[in-house]
Amino acid sequence: ETSPEYDGNLLSELNALYEGGDSFNNIKSQFLPKRPIEKSELVSSTHYDLRLESAFYTNYAAGIVDWFSAKVVEGNPRIIVGDNISDLSKAYWESLNHNADGCGNPLVTLCRWAAREIIINSRAYWCIKFNEENSIDGRLSLFDAITVDDWQKDVDNGVQWIRRHTVDTIRDEEKPWSAATKELHFWTFYDNEKIIIYTASRDVGKNWNKKDIAIKTFEQYHEFGNPVFDIRSDESMWVMDRIKEPAIKLFQREANLNFYLDNVTIQVPYLNLNDPESWKSLPMTPLGAIVLGLNEKFGYASPSSAGFEPSFKSIELCKRSFYESLQIMAKEAAALPQAGRLSGEAVESMQKPMEILLGSFAWPIQDALERSIASLKEYRTEPDADIRVVGFGKIEADETELEELIFGQGVVNGAETKEGGEGGEETTDD
């Protein structure tokens, strides 16, 4: 069982729209439904299969998400350490700036990942981990929304406990070059007292059955308190959920246009002969030649491009929906009281609606980070240490940058449509 608030299918779709590539192609049919005529028994399934195969996903969503994420951290979030602690302790706190997770990733990178996660999935979690037993030098880790599938909140709306579900694949030890044959599933519980891990395995592609039992493989008690801190993003600022429908509709429109461009806009050779019946006696050999008479001509004809104008305009309207959805979100963010949760410096510097929208992603990350640091200070018996998080108060952005990002000067926006006559466009050799 998962939390009633957890929607794994929705999160999978949102992540596929962001990631593109194989993640998108594996569920592409969910985004390109069959037309009523394609469901009929009178129409071959080949038509839909060809349309699906030719459908290409232009990943506008990833550009938006990555631009937002980069803007959130352009002030270079970092930890500032005062002088009221020992040199050894100061070295530890400052080390988090360039190696926040113990794997070499700096704090600004983790903050950018956190911004990306709440923009796509609306929630994320900081987790404090200790790489060595009895160590007090904790490191930060980021948990994404799709793996945290169950949780309970306390009376203060904080995290009481969470369950994280992750999967590893296992290859045959005797055939390490072969594809993975087993899935190893881990369910990790985090609460105020302990960390417990349950494990189970199954064949790749198989479902669980009643005989499958998860076995407790790890249990560790600790005195840190709950090491997980939720990044509390406002659900009304869930960007990827807001632009999901425009992204899907844009994909469908582009897929339909590409299919017909590939299959309809083919130049067809033709002969314009004086005697309509003379074509019956024309030689058909690879080395043959046709001598045209007076007023006869040979050429190529193709459909008029004017017929595709509605499709191009529809694509432009879908891209406009992207832009307008985000514009509305920016204006909503500027009107919400959450803008006051930013520091005085940030409120003063962020005046434009787009800047305030980006600030609405910055403050939850900073807030969760400060709660994490406060717990670490208590655990290290340094409650009065002057440790501050800075760098979230400088964001400069406006709608013009977003407009350029979405529309750019691509084929659809910059191409000029050349209309032909009733008979289409043609080139001839008289």
Q: Model-found features: residue ranges?
A:
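Short secondary-structure junctions and interdomain/linker hinges
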Residues: 21, 71, 75, 99-108, ...
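C-terminal helix-loop subdomains that flank or include functional centers
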Residues: 281-289, 296, 310, 317-430
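Leucine-centric amphipathic alpha-helical interface motifs
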Residues: 1-27, 271-274, 411-413, 417-430
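Extended, helix-rich architectural segments
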Residues: 1-137
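Extended, charged amphipathic alpha-helical segments
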Residues: 207-344
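Extended, regular secondary-structure scaffolds
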Residues: 125-232
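Short amphipathic alpha-helical segments
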Residues: 88, 92, 106-110, 242, ...
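A general structural signal for short secondary-structure junctions and capping/turn motifs
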Residues: 115-119, 175-178, 187-188, 258-261, ...
